[in-house]
């Protein structure tokens, strides 16, 4: 385990700060003016050599200065960093943007990704709270003509999912009415995950009492139910990611952009809700496409309604102190807004 002296920590902190703010390698002469302690340029050079031996900073080919390594960023985040207090203007932007009127949780969560992206200029992700508390509160089939129906599913927290389907020509509206009544009588009030589990066995057996071949209806009901129960990732600032891709080939860039549209792969990258703000740097992210990036994730808690995740993806040379402070403030404001929303439905 690496242990730095106070002076070495101050030098590493200054190198990280200068490089993330200016993007240029940092030399000993500039550090002489910046450090809060009086020390000679020669002493700083010696300490920088020690930091380089430890693998915390590296020399570039274009300059005599040094830049932080992935290992250096990791040490800085774990042992030196103190989150900045969020700027008052940024806090007002968050509160104002989340202070509007929203009709669905997804609208709040989607808006959050856009707000966070605008504040950071990075690519951001928001995952809505877990759906363990979501229950089925209603289901309807609306005939549209030409053997088409719209399936509408409503949950207890106000979410509405709808999809249009073509039903087999041998199934009539009269045959579907008792099926919808069965769902209202037997399934309304159950958690969505319980209803999904019953789709594999119990529900098909019971629907066979009403339909000769229930498969067509099961496809309809299962599709809209799965959509309502699925994880929802929202992405803000997709194009921001390409501001930090100098070392990647066109093929890698295409794969990277494609990744942002794949919920399952995003879920693996971002991970489940945790206990605190987490920072993963370079190879710590479970996807080779993101080896030159850093990912900051924060879990927000909405009491019995579960937990969600906010995340931002940017270059390894990001201002971690400001970003972590901002994520903490955003985490609190989003949780407060969602608690207000849930309180309305709980009443």
UniProtKB/Swiss-Prot annotation:
Gene3D superfamilies: 3.30.450.40, Heat-inducible transcription repressor hrca homolog, domain 3 (3.30.390.60), Winged helix-like DNA-binding domain superfamily/Winged helix DNA-binding domain (1.10.10.10)
Keywords tagged on the record: Repressor, Stress response, Transcription, Transcription regulation
SUPFAM superfamilies reported in the protein's UniProt record: GAF domain-like (SSF55781), Winged helix' DNA-binding domain (SSF46785)
Alphabetical list of InterPro entries matching this protein: GAF-like_dom_sf, HrcA, HrcA_C, WH-like_DNA-bd_sf, WH_DNA-bd_sf, WHTH_HrcA_DNA-bd, WHTH_transcript_rep_HrcA_IDD
Highest taxon, organism lineage: Bacteria
Gene Ontology MF, one: DNA binding
UniProt-listed GO biological process terms: negative regulation of DNA-templated transcription
Keyword Translocase recorded: no
NCBIfam families: hrcA (TIGR00331)
Family (UniProt): Belongs to the HrcA family.
Record function comment: Negative regulator of class I heat shock genes (grpE-dnaK-dnaJ and groELS operons). Prevents heat-shock induction of these operons.
PANTHER family (UniProt xref): HEAT-INDUCIBLE TRANSCRIPTION REPRESSOR HRCA
Stated name of the protein: Heat-inducible transcription repressor HrcA
Gene this chain is encoded by: hrcA
